[in-house]
A protein has these predicted regions:
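Nucleotide phosphate-binding/pyrophosphate-handling subdomain across enzymes
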Residues: 1-54
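C-terminal helical cap/extension that packs against the catalytic core
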Residues: 3, 41-112
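Structural beta-sheet core signal
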Residues: 27-29, 59, 115
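Short, active-site-adjacent cap segments at secondary-structure transitions
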Residues: 35, 121-123
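Short secondary-structure boundary/capping segments
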Residues: 44, 130-132
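Short, flexible loop segments at boundaries between secondary-structure elements
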Residues: 62-65, 134-144
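Active-site-proximal loop/hinge segments that shape catalytic or ion-binding/gating pockets
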Residues: 118
Length: 144
């Protein structure tokens, strides 16, 4: 499966990255606490509610960062508040396990995977994959 990692963590960057998705995609989302949480989540919730491009979402919590993670319970509550509790979702606090779950979902559905919401989540998962697969980070990392 094609997996895309994005450090988008505010409304504008999340909206931009979601707009660039051209194939059905499972979303793995986790972020650090911020003052305007709901404003930051507006683009994600809007896309999940009206766009069939995102058939499933997995919520997780970054392990590192300056601020504490937004809990998976809080993310699920926001989803319910937006009236989109019908979108198939899964919650897993451990981002490593969440990554495996989201990857399996994407593989089973034959769709892509987008990891988004926090630079710390991206860093946690890059470290995990490098260690899990015995990779050299500098050999596999590409920038665009």
């Amino acid at each position: 499966i094609t997996t895309r990692l994005s450090a988008a963590h505010n409304a504008e960057s999340i909206e931009s990255d979601l707009y660039e998705v051209t194939r059905p995609t499972v979303v793995l989302f986790g972020m650090s606490k911020k003052a305007e949480l709901r404003k930051s989540l507006d683009p994600l919730m809007a896309e999940l509610s009206m766009d069939r491009m995102f058939p499933k979402v997995v919520f997780t919590e970054p392990m590192s960062g300056r601020n504490p993670a937004v809990t998976v319970e809080e993310l699920s509550e926001v989803m319910e508040d937006y009236g989109i509790g019908y979108v198939p979702s899964k919650v897993e606090k451990d981002p490593h396990k969440a990554f495996e779950i989201a990857g399996s979902m994407a593989k089973d559905l034959g769709v892509d995977l987008l990891v988004i919401g926090s630079v710390y989540l991206v860093g946690d998962l890059l470290n995990y994959v490098v260690e899990r697969d015995g990779l050299d980070l500098w050999e596999v990392l590409t920038a665009h």
